[in-house]
């Protein structure tokens, strides 16, 4: 017996392609423009999900790579675009990507920095790259430095702080930054507004 068959119809071909072709959703461009689009991309049922998150001033989110943490950060920055914010991360690629995404959306009120660059810049020479490599920065030095920065005329008066990849930064300033810079008053983390992501 021969099982040879002639050309497939267009409908049959589309059915075959649908069954065997991988479904890959490219998310690298983060082309979502609005909160509903972002929630749709995240497979959220409705806008209430992110809205309820934004009502809490202190949010910590765990999620592996590709779970939408950067998209949530972008939506958060977009929602609070009239306020001054600080986005900190560990790696240079993520910082560059976030700068690009925010610039493309004309979201100019959020400073994007690597934590190392940020702390070296505000330290006035008290810490260096080697201090980060050796993990030799004391909590007391960080607190003194951050409080000095917060009381200086150069402090941008951040309304919120986002820290991405916090698991890489817990021993080099993430807690001190949240405690010293995210609070409106002197009660630190208890009264600050922040969004923290970790894997």
Spans of features found by a protein language model:
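The feature marks helicase ATPase cores and/or their adjacent C-terminal helical subdomains
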Residues: 1-199
């Amino acid at each position: 017996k021969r099982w040879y068959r002639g050309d497939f119809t267009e409908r049959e071909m589309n059915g075959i392609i649908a069954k065997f072709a991988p479904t890959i959703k490219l998310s690298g461009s983060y082309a979502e423009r609005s909160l509903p689009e972002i929630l749709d991309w995240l497979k959220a049922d409705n806008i209430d999900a992110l809205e309820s998150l934004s009502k809490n001033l202190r949010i910590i989110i765990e999620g592996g790579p590709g779970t939408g943490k950067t998209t949530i950060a972008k939506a958060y920055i977009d929602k609070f675009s009239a306020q001054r914010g600080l986005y900190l991360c560990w790696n240079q690629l993520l910082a560059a990507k976030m700068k690009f995404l925010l610039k493309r959306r004309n979201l100019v009120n959020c400073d994007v920095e690597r934590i190392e660059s940020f702390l070296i810049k505000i330290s006035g020479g008290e810490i260096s790259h080697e201090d980060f490599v050796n993990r030799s920065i004391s909590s007391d030095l960080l607190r003194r430095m951050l409080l000095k920065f917060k009381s200086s005329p150069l402090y941008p008066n951040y309304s919120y702080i986002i820290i991405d990849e916090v698991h890489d930064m817990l021993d080099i300033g993430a807690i001190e930054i949240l405690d010293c810079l995210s609070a409106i008053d002197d009660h630190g983390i208890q009264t600050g507004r922040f969004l923290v992501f970790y894997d």
